[in-house]
Curated annotation (Swiss-Prot):
Domain commentary: The Asp-Asp-Xaa-Xaa-Asp/Glu (DDXXD/E) motif is important for the catalytic activity, presumably through binding to Mg(2+).
The protein's name: Diterpene synthase 3, chloroplastic
Gene this chain is encoded by: TPS3
Residue sites binding Mg(2+) 2 per the record: 528, 532
Cofactor(s) it depends on: Mg(2+); Mn(2+)
Pfam families, per the entry: Terpene_synth, Terpene_synth_C
Length: 774
């Protein structure tokens, strides 16, 4: 019998108040309600919220020198009398002439020092554009000098390589050489670049998965390959440069229509991607949710998601023809309860994603949201992309520190195995101020790297933490007042109990829910240790008897000191949450909580009986009892009654409630059994893993673990399906409590018994005690 959250061997340091004297106890401050007066609010808090709300109306897109250069190369369909073409977009040419840097390059302002390959590519494209129309001889000369002085960057492995650079840049160099523009470049390096280009083309041409990639980076080299990817708006991949190159190679009225649209919208300089509205808006929503401040922008977020869902239903190409947008839309829509199919995500081409880590990461996170048995392709995508991203980590090929951390987190902590506040803190700590993204060229993602996002999230995190710290003091006072510090096995339970509460139920208005969760966690751990290790059979039976009688004067009962302490603390805890829950629900809910505790105690006694008789139950018989002895009922249901929504008797008796209860209990128990079999066998206790092996003949332990993990994964998907169903009778905040419990156990048992993890000890301290400092 092991408790849901707490282990008898937990390595947490003892509570600082475990042995507090009565005098010290009296000096402890009483916690105050901070729902209306959290820690002091900075005068800029509301101002930042207002500025963030306005970003949903912003649709600014950063300009791209590279794309502008290709647009500037486009000839006009009109011919002068001599038959020579004119530039179709003279404003783009003018922009090139007016925006060369002093060093001769056409770098973006304040470009990153690792983006020299991008600068080389953009500068060469500008040179070719000006040369095509016989303009800017001095600009061209300065640009060529820059290329000569910085050409070695093209082969520098420490530099960030834009998508397709190994094809695009050598191809432009070839064209420049044919025009006798670059006679002084290092010929050995030039030859090496050409060889790399040829090898890359050969490698990609042999893979059907790379066809779209070649069309994107081919810059009009293969009309048949490129034009099959033309979209309804006339573009190729929503890329002005790819579309311009395709038009130059073979004029097409739809391509020209798209280019006219982009130039008319943005003026001479064009962006690297257009349109980008859906992805930009979704990225903003994702940032706010990851940083833990989405509750301040519910209306704006709902508007974005509703509009995205309409576009999804209508089959909008901006979603379905871009892997990043499709994956992000799918993930945010599904996790927010919209009914969306995973089929579009599974059509994302994996072949070229090793060249675009951002896209690979986006699709990988989406692929974690498998719900249904038929979504096998989504699971395969998850497996293949997980391996790809792990290779990127192992080979140290991700040069961005923030992106490396984000990929590592996604691999280590899938969304179903990381607590809310834990994820929020990691997102804050890894927040990337640099809005630069890399495709064929660099561009700035609108609203990415927004300083207000970070400042608001840090202040909000610390304000909530200040409230949690006050609650924690009250929690420790409860621990000491109920003499739980006198039970040696219970001394290390306080922090884990409150950590899981604060990390999953963090809202300022949910103090009662946090305290109910945390106190019941500790009580179950105390009871679990007592039935496992400390208590005699007579003492166990006495505890059961006292809970059955309930209204007893413990001072008149003949029982041990341990039994007296445990029953008194349990009665006080149940009575407290019962009173609060009864007031909120408008009916007496205490008998239900007592009944849940009795079910738990009866299941404990069944395990004591099995251990004492040395008899082994069947796997199914064991799991039926073990799902109860795991202790989910008292923690979760007590919390349900004080988390907010009204829970009628019809809801509590509804099959959906019982189904969710059983699924979650069983899934959590399976996770525990897989990671604790050796310890429990040493204690002479039955465990599901050896029982499962015994019932399946010669099955190896590894095979049994694999099958039990598959069982737990299936249960997790069923649970999430219920939680995300917006049409269910059970209130969403209540379903979320079940999900929080599952996530906590997924975290603790994702690799081994997490109660031994120094990493989780550190996380618990960070969430409850350590403010974020900028």
């Amino acid at each position: 019998m092991i408790s849901l959250m707490l282990s008898s061997s937990s390595p947490f340091r003892s509570s600082p108040f475990s042995h507090a004297s009565s005098a010290a106890l009296d000096r402890l401050p009483r916690a105050t309600k901070l729902t209306t007066e959290l820690a002091s609010v900075s005068p800029w808090f509301e101002e930042r919220k207002g500025r963030i709300a306005k970003v949903f109306d912003k649709k600014e897109v950063g300009i791209s020198t590279y794309d502008t250069a290709w647009v500037a190369m486009v000839p006009s369909p009109l011919m002068i009398s001599s038959g020579e073409p004119l530039p179709c977009f003279p404003d783009s040419l003018l922009w090139l002439l007016e925006n060369q840097c002093h060093d001769g390059s056409w770098a973006q302002p304040h470009h990153h020092s690792l983006l020299n390959k991008d600068v080389l590519s953009s500068t060469l494209a500008c040179i070719l554009a000006l040369n095509k129309w016989g303009l800017g001889d001095q600009h061209i000369a300065k640009g060529l000098h820059f290329l000569e002085m910085n050409f070695d960057s093209a082969m520098d492995p420490s530099q960030i390589t834009p998508i397709g650079f190994d094809i695009v840049f050598p191809t432009m160099l070839d064209h420049a050489r044919s025009l006798s523009l670059i006679p002084t470049l290092d010929q050995t390096m030039l030859k090496e670049l050409m060889n790399m280009r040829d090898l890359e083309l050969k490698r990609c041409s042999s893979s059907p998965d790379m066809e779209a990639y070649l069309a994107y980076v081919g810059e009009g080299q293969d009309r048949e390959r490129v034009m099959k990817y033309q979209r309804k708006n006339g573009s190729l991949f929503n890329s002005p440069s790819t579309t311009a190159a395709a038009y130059i190679a073979s004029p097409n009225s739809e391509c020209l229509k798209y280019l006219n649209l982009v130039v008319n919208k943005f003026g001479g300089a064009v962006p690297a991607v257009y349109p980008l509205d859906i992805y930009s808006q979704l990225h903003t929503v994702d940032d706010l949710e990851r940083l833990g401040i989405s509750r301040y922008f519910v209306t704006e977020i709902e508007s974005v998601l509703d509009q995205t869902y309409r576009c999804w239903v209508q089959g909008d190409e901006e979603i379905f023809l871009d892997a990043s947008t499709c994956a992000l839309a799918f993930r945010l829509l599904r996790i927010n309860g919209y009914n969306v199919s995973s089929d579009p995500v599974t059509h994302c081409v994996v072949g070229h994603m090793n060249k675009d880590v951002n896209t690979a990461l986006e699709v990988y996170k989406a692929s974690q949201l498998t719900l249904y048995p038929h979504e096998t392709q989504l699971e395969k995508l998850n497996s293949s992309l997980g391996a790809l991203l792990q290779d990127q980590i192992s080979s140290a090929s991700i040069q961005s520190t923030q992106l490396h951390a984000e990929v590592q987190q996604a691999l280590d902590y899938p969304f179903y195995a990381i607590l809310q506040r834990m994820a929020n803190r990691k997102a804050i700590e890894h927040y990337n101020f640099d809005p630069t993204r890399i495709l064929k060229t660099s561009y700035c993602l609108p609203n990415s790297g927004n300083k207000d996002f970070l400042l608001l999230s840090v202040e909000d995190f610390n304000r909530l933490q200040a409230m949690h710290q006050e609650e924690y003091k009250e929690f420790e006072r409860w621990f000491v007042e109920n003499r739980l510090d006198e039970l040696e096995v219970a001394r290390q339970k306080v922090e884990y109990g409150y950590f899981t509460a604060a990390a999953t139920i963090s809202g300022p208005e949910l103090s009662d829910a946090r305290m109910s969760w945390a106190k019941n966690c500790v009580m179950i751990s105390v009871m679990d240790d007592f039935f496992d290790i400390r208590g005699s059979v007579q003492e166990m039976e006495k505890i059961v008897e006292l809970v059955e009688l309930w209204d007893v004067d413990i001072s008149r009962e003949c029982c041990s000191n341990d039994v007296s302490i445990i029953f008194s603390a349990l009665k006080q805890t149940i009575s407290e949450v019962g009173d609060k829950g009864s007031k909120l629900q408008g009916r007496n809910i205490t008998p239900h909580i007592i009944a849940l505790w009795l079910d738990l105690l009866y299941s404990y006694m069944k395990e004591v009986e099995w251990s004492g008789s040395c008899s082994n139950p069947s796997f199914d018989e064991y799991m039926s009892n073990a799902s109860v002895s795991f202790g989910l009922g008292p923690i979760v249901v007590s919390t349900l009654y004080v988390v907010g929504p009204h829970l009628s008797l019809d809801m509590i008796n509804h099959s959906q409630y019982h189904n969710l209860f059983t699924l979650t209990s069983t899934c959590c128990r399976l996770l525990h059994e897989i990671r604790s079999d050796e310890r429990e066998l040493k204690q002479g206790k039955p465990n599901a893993l050896p029982l499962y092996i015994a019932e399946n003949g010669s099955m190896s332990k590894e095979a049994a673990i694999s099958e039990m993990i598959t069982m737990s994964n299936t249960l997790r998907k069923q649970i999430l399906t219920i939680v995300l169903d917006n049409n269910s009778v059970f209130p969403k905040p209540c379903k979320q409590i079940f999900w929080n419990m599952l996530v906590a156990n997924q975290l603790f048992y994702r690799k081994d018994d997490g109660f031994w993890s120094k990493e989780l000890l550190k996380v618990a301290h960070q969430i409850v005690h350590q403010p974020i400092l900028l």
